[in-house]
Amino acid sequence: MGVMDVMFRDEQPTVRFGETFVASESFKMLFREGMTLVEETAAYLDGPGRDESRLLARHAALTYASESMRLTTRLMQIASWLLVQRAVSEGELSLSEAAEEKTRVRLSTAEPNESAPVLVAELPLSLQALIAQSKRLHARILHLDRLISDDRPTPEPRVSPVFAQHDMLRVAFG
């Protein structure tokens, strides 16, 4: 009986999450959700929101103005990210071109000078709901962006523990 040579091989190419995600049905649903939220927010701020803001006390009206600006900024970042990812999915942009676009429009991870919750509580419920929805969507997109990002280090190849044990046996027993 001859010596059996066992080798650990993993020659499968690494699956890049970003490339597969932007082509998935999940991304299409996320895209629709994001763009729908942008449209709903624009319709609200141009219609009922404008009317509701006129009924607010002065301090609440100032909070309304600052929170609606934060909301639209957050939604512009979301829409920009979604459009870049869709362009990658449809072959209009390469991953490297998308990375360049990412440096132009950054997803902010923190919002400075956020209004106190007690002030936000005085805002119309419709605006509060849009703010909450946009924050949840923004958090999801930040998470996805970190997963897709090429900034993560490439994992180093690992030696198979089975191969190492087999090698020790081969050395010990020839």
What are these regions (language model features)?
Residues 2-174:
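Surface-exposed peri-terminal alpha-helical interaction modules
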